[in-house]
Amino acid sequence: MKRKLLVAVPLLCVVVVLAWFFRPKHEYLGEAYVSERSTTLWSSVAQVREPIDVLHYGDRVDVIARRNDTVKVRTGSGAVGWVDARLLLEPALWQRSIKILNAAKAMPVQARGRTKVQTNLRVEPGRTEPRLYQFSRGVPVEVVARGVADWVQVSDERENNEAQETKKEDWFLVRGLATRPPGEVSARSSESNTTTPPGDQTIPIAGWVVARFVELDLPEAVREGMASANVRATAWFELNRVATPSGDKPQSLVAGTRSAEGQPCDFTVLRVYTWNQRRTRYETAFIENNLCGQMPIRLDKGPKGEPEFRFRQISGAKEERVYRLTQTVVRRVREPGEANKKTARASAAKSAKP
């Protein structure tokens, strides 16, 4: 018996070593992150295949093989299967998305809205820039900046054989939420107050989207006023609320433009809508035209708590402008030095007259 054990034990060790040496090996090609809300992990690339698992946005995977447009990956739970390589982000792009998010978090919100259609989120303005995510229709987003990019209409988007034409289009830097089924955990998580469907787990995300694919959530009276004035809104804010017998009424500031997309100015028009207590309706309390304003517009408070807003004027006399709402009257607030310069210019012009 002892002799048999002396033979069996070394033989078993040899078998174990050989099995380990000749085990199937997976080459490690790097890591990647899922860029879709959800995608299926398949057993093979054949037409007849089985689903192994479901991956979600932000999941980290190890890439162990490549075949055309598909990659073989290993998940954090150890599952191995195939996914579309176009649905994964390289580590450098993932880190870039984190930097964009951190920068967007520090920016003041310029407007709130929802996606009109399925909308690609990109790292920079431009339809050829790398894609980070795709929002579904009706997803809430917060606008924090505006940009401009060239847009070339390809031939299948035109009804004739005209030469391809390069246009400029507006883009918004937005922050929103990538939603995940309940119970899922991702590589990036944080708090956010954007409304999402009950039960969904969410992680914040930021990037650039085509501006006209976002519908701003303007109050109805403001929307009607902007439409009748033929002004396209690019930013809007609630300045304050006034008490009425039927409840508090918000008073709003809206920035917009009448120009086509792709202009250097973020907005050229400012309008303030206030509530008229006597007539029980909204009215346009303030209009400023012929601006060339730059986002962000920042809200503040005056010495008595009055709403103030400020922005940079980037044409003509490049300066910061400040306005204050007192009850239903909006006036520009000038710094003492600025007021003296204006008085001096007026006096010089008056003395120059014959």
Can you name each region flagged by the protein language model?
Residues 2-5, 17-36, 50, 60-62, ...:
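Boundary regions of SH3-family modules and the immediately adjacent low-complexity/disordered segments
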Residues 6-13:
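Sec-dependent N-terminal signal peptides
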Residues 40-44, 112, 116, 121-124, ...:
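Core beta-strand residues in small-molecule sensory/regulatory alpha/beta domains
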